[in-house]
Design a protein with these regions (language model features):
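A solvent-exposed interaction/effector surface
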Residues: 1-168
């Protein structure tokens, strides 16, 4: 059975709907940074999704080819995560999504080193005939955080964020 990060780390991927404290350890990610409305079908965000998932699946399926990664285990690709902000805005201005600046990312298994990531970029570029150079290998060490599950439309996120701010 493939290792599933959502099931094995429920405290990170299936949090309570109430704000709470959690310590998040360092984790490696494939990331792409960009700007603009994520709903624009011709925008940077759509291109970033192709890069992120292209690399995530190149790594996941690497065991079927000749390349061997030390410590490899079969796994379910973790969910997409993102960091969003807008310059000069207090909170989020959903009426102006074109001003979003974002980092979208997918967690990488612990066996993926920078060298393995670089191999995946070269492999995906060669196989898919696309540019994967916008992707970066990054380690995030979040430490102590306030976490809460938001359920509902994006436009109601500010209320969830207010609850988290009040808790903190």
């Amino acid at each position: 059975m493939a290792f599933d990060y959502k099931k094995e780390y429920k405290e990170f991927y299936l949090p309570s709907r109430k704000p709470h404290l959690i310590t998040v350890p360092p984790m490696n990610f494939v990331t792409v940074q960009g700007k603009g409305d994520p709903n624009d079908p011709a925008g940077e965000y759509q291109a970033a999704m192709e890069v992120l998932y292209g690399l995530a699946y190149t790594i996941k399926m690497s065991y079927k080819g000749s390349h061997r990664m030390e410590g490899f285990f079969e796994y379910v690709v973790p969910p997409l995560e993102g960091l969003w902000h807008q310059q000069g805005v207090d909170g989020v201005d959903y009426a102006h999504k074109e001003t979003f600046e974002w980092t979208s990312m997918i967690r990488l298994p612990e066996f993926v080193t920078r060298e393995e990531f670089d191999w995946a970029v070269q492999e995906a570029t060669a196989k898919k005939k696309q540019d994967f150079s916008t992707a970066e290998f990054r380690t995030y060490d979040e430490g102590l955080c306030v976490q809460c599950m938001h359920i509902g439309p994006y436009d109601t996120e500010p209320e969830t964020l207010r609850q988290m701010d009040a808790f903190a």
